[in-house]
């Protein structure tokens, strides 16, 4: 018994070819399938068909006197290239096969199909060409010389699925008879084939891309580069790309968007919108001729650049948008005053005494006086009063806050001075001086340039705090040899030699 698993790829392929099986390239994924197929052939008792003895080579007949080859009975009719095209291309491959070998191939296929329905036939274009090509033939394919293209005219080969053959079909075997088969394809099917449609398989590239959801090489559909519908105008900014998106090396060299959106033309603004933009500082004007005059804005400043067409000099004027807003508010108040005066004149109960100009003039003066009183009582006086209250409240708040901050700073300076005085008294005690004069400490800490009223007032507060609250220091009065009294401090705390 031959050990199939120890065979090399070439030996496995040769054994399968000898037993009439169609073998493609033996790889890591197909070897297990071919091993199963060879084991089944060996276990089924399939014998190696006897190779026909090669007789003397007969003289090659001319194309005119060559007899027509007999077609085998077992394979069904199939598509073939016309005789004229085949003769012109010189692509006919003549191969001699034993009829019993062909029938054994169909028997082995039937047994395999009955035993295991899950095993599928693996075919590749290279294996189909190499398994049935004659060693001495040097013919070329029919389509040699045509350029390889991926245009929509390219067609892919359909998928063939073998159909089962009934068991009771009579088969005739003749081992001695030989049949010469004129093949125009790269493979001879052993059983009738039928075309089975596979969902999702693309067998033809057509100009219609209704069923395609993505781009195909060589068959790019026409694209609409401009969206003109009203609904798509809101998506104009979606096709824009930034430099950050193009920094990724993974998509380098690839376009980020195939859609070019149409730039929306600026719409015409009305009077109200122009006035509002002018108040906000966005109402820029530019001349029809480029470079004659235009506006710029930098923060709260507006810059007007204007070119003199005669001299060619450029004039730059700078204004502030807040000034324009103030003038605009004054204009609004004036317009409101005029409207109120007209409304008062039309609705007042005071009628002109005379129907001449003096009578109507009196009504207009009364309307102006009443309008001013209205503005003063309901606009100016409340605003001024509110402003005064706001200023007073803000002054009180910020004044109190400033007072607290100054008080905290003064307390911090006072405590810092107390620490310095205490440290000086302790150091004097360590050096061997039991008493320290208060004026001496003052002169050391405050030179004559710093003896101002604020510093002297802080010194008095520090002396008072030490005499009252400091337990490590005692205050005494010594009488000097001159008879004068002097206030001194004495350190009565810990006599440690450490210097802090």
Swiss-Prot record:
Biased composition annotated in UniProt, kind: Pro residues: 58-75
Q: Where is the composition biased (Acidic residues)?
A: 103-122
Q: Which UniProt keywords apply?
A: Cell cycle, Chromosome, Membrane, Nucleus, Transmembrane, Transmembrane helix
Membrane topology note = Multi-pass membrane protein
Biased-composition ranges, Low complexity, are 46-57, 77-89, 130-141, 168-197
The UniProt entry, under PANTHER family, shows: INNER NUCLEAR MEMBRANE PROTEIN MAN1, INNER NUCLEAR MEMBRANE PROTEIN MAN1 LEM DOMAIN CONTAINING PROTEIN
Protein name in UniProt: LEM protein 2
Q: Which organism is it from?
A: Caenorhabditis elegans
């Amino acid at each position: 018994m031959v050990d199939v698993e120890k065979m090399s790829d070439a030996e496995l392929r040769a054994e399968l070819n000898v037993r009439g099986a169609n073998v493609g390239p033996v790889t890591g994924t197909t070897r297990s399938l071919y091993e199963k197929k060879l084991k089944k052939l060996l276990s089924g008792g399939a014998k190696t068909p006897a190779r026909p003895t090669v007789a003397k080579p007969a003289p090659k007949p001319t194309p005119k006197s060559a007899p027509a080859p007999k077609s085998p009975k077992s394979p069904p009719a199939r598509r073939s290239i016309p005789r004229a095209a085949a003769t012109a291309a010189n692509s006919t491959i003549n191969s001699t096969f034993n009829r019993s070998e062909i029938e054994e191939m169909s028997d082995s296929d039937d047994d395999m199909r009955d035993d295991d329905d899950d095993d599928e036939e693996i075919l590749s274009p290279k294996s189909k060409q190499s398994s049935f090509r004659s060693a001495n033939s040097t013919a070329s394919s029919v389509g040699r010389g045509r350029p390889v293209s991926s245009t929509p005219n390219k067609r892919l080969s359909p998928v063939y699925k073998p159909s089962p053959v009934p068991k009771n079909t009579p088969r005739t075997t003749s081992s001695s008879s030989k049949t010469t088969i004129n093949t125009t394809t790269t493979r001879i099917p052993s059983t009738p084939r039928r075309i089975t449609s596979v969902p999702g398989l693309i067998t033809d590239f057509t100009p219609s891309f209704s069923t395609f959801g993505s781009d195909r090489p060589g068959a790019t559909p026409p694209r609409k580069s401009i969206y003109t519908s009203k609904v798509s105008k809101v998506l104009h900014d979606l096709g824009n790309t930034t430099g950050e998106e193009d920094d990724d090396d993974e998509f380098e060299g690839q376009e980020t968007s195939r859609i070019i959106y149409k730039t929306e033309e600026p719409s015409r603004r009305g009077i109200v919108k122009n006035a509002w933009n002018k108040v906000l500082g966005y109402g820029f004007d530019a001349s029809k001729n480029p470079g004659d005059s235009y506006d710029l804005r930098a923060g709260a400043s507006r810059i007007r650049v204007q070119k003199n067409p005669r001299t060619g000099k450029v004039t730059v004027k700078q204004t502030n948008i807040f000034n324009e807003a103030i003038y605009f508010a004054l204009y609004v108040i004036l317009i409101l005053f005029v409207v109120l005066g007209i409304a008062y004149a039309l609705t007042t109960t005071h009628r002109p005494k005379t129907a001449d100009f003096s009578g109507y003039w009196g009504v207009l003066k009364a309307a102006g006086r009443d309008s001013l009183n209205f503005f003063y009582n309901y606009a100016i006086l409340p605003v001024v009063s509110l402003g005064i209250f706001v200023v007073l409240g803000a002054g009180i708040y910020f004044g109190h806050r400033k007072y607290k901050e100054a008080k905290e700073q003064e307390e911090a300076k006072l405590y810092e001075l107390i620490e310095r005085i205490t440290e000086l008294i302790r150091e004097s005690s360590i050096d061997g001086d039991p008493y320290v004069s208060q004026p001496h400490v003052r002169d050391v800490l405050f030179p004559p340039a710093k003896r101002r009223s604020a510093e002297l007032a802080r010194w008095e507060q520090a002396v008072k705090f030490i005499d009252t609250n400091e337990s490590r220091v005692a205050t005494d009065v010594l009488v000097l040899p001159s008879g004068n009294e002097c206030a001194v401090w004495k350190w009565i705390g810990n006599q440690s030699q450490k210097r802090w």
